[in-house]
Amino acid sequence: MDNVANNDVDVLEKQAAFLSSALPYMQKYENETVVIKYGGHAMGNLALGQAFARDIALLKQSGVNPIVVHGGGPRIAETLKKMGIESRFESGLRVTDEKIVEVVEMVLAGSINKEIVALINAEGEWAIGLCGKDGNMVFAEKVHKTVIDPNSNSERVLDLGFVGEPVEIDRTLLDFLACSEMIPVIAPIAPGRDGKTYNINADIFAGAIAGALEAKRLLFLTDVPGVLDKEGKVLKELTVTEAKNLIKDGTISGGMIPKVETCINAIQGGVEGVVILNGKTSHPVLLELFTEHGAGTLIIS
């Protein structure tokens, strides 16, 4: 020990202090389900991906039941471009035809999903890759998106093709995996009762899974630090009512609106709390769950 430099001792002491201070939070989440939506630019960074996998492994070792739901939009766009498949857009939304949904399923369920599974397994845990089709876990229906036509100022329904929303969730498989000490990693692909395959927004998919399981927490790893006030500062905690008011007064705007609305729907569906946090930082999951002040914006009922 005499050979260890003082700064090394300081680092070790800080690590020990963190572990000690984390104990009550580990106890708080023991045997609880935490759904983590993994997405954003962090997915394209190997070092952050490995850190994320280690965090998930640590959650499992701490007695938490983590469930990972992932997206993969940038990789899908990249693959479509490589394959020479052009995308068509309606009011800024991608139309997913039969050819594109096959590529989406290949990329999400066949490529990205298995990469995340491999990273978690490399940390000594048992992760298993799934999508909504497995065990009839999720059934979807076609999304009917209504927009205002700028020319006529009247409503019209967009046909986005094979874009769906979850309407039925059977938790049997997920409950079984929790009892068998496995970590589910789920791609947001699901069948419809019509026999077709649907691509589902990963945020909405994660919210539906978390609601069906009455999860203790749903974490959205994003490219932003949380919900910001008008001065650009992170709001540490919001109630559903406060979040709705911030949408009304324009504080919450743009792409953050559908994300916060998904948080609200998840809470109304049975989730105790939903957190929006920055997935581009080191160990955001541990900082949120195992520290006093958390790492993002917590939305509660």
Swiss-Prot record:
GO cellular component terms listed in the entry, alphabetical order: cytoplasm
Family annotation (InterPro entries): AceGlu_kinase-like_sf, AcgluKinase_fam, ArgB, Asp/Glu/Uridylate_kinase, Glu/AcGlu_kinase, NAGK-C
Pfam families cross-referenced by the UniProt entry: AA_kinase
Binding-site residues for substrate, renumbered to this chain: G72, G73, R94, N199
Location of this chain's protein in the cell: Cytoplasm
The enzyme's E.C. designation: 2.7.2.8
GO biological process, one term: L-arginine biosynthetic process
Marked site positions, Transition state stabilizer: K37, K259
Enzyme class: transferase
Catalytic activity: N-acetyl-L-glutamate + ATP = N-acetyl-L-glutamyl 5-phosphate + ADP
Cited Gene3D superfamilies: Acetylglutamate kinase-like (3.40.1160.10)
GO molecular function: acetylglutamate kinase activity; ATP binding
TM regions (residue ranges): none
Keyword entries, A-Z: Amino-acid biosynthesis, Arginine biosynthesis, ATP-binding, Cytoplasm, Kinase, Nucleotide-binding, Transferase
Pathway assignment: Amino-acid biosynthesis; L-arginine biosynthesis; N(2)-acetyl-L-ornithine from L-glutamate: step 2/4
Family: Belongs to the acetylglutamate kinase family. ArgB subfamily.
Role played: Catalyzes the ATP-dependent phosphorylation of N-acetyl-L-glutamate.
PANTHER family: N-ACETYLGLUTAMATE SYNTHASE (PTHR23342), N-ACETYLGLUTAMATE SYNTHASE, MITOCHONDRIAL (PTHR23342:SF0)
Name the record gives this protein: Acetylglutamate kinase
Organism, scientific name: Bartonella bacilliformis (strain ATCC 35685 / KC583 / Herrer 020/F12,63)
Primary gene name: argB
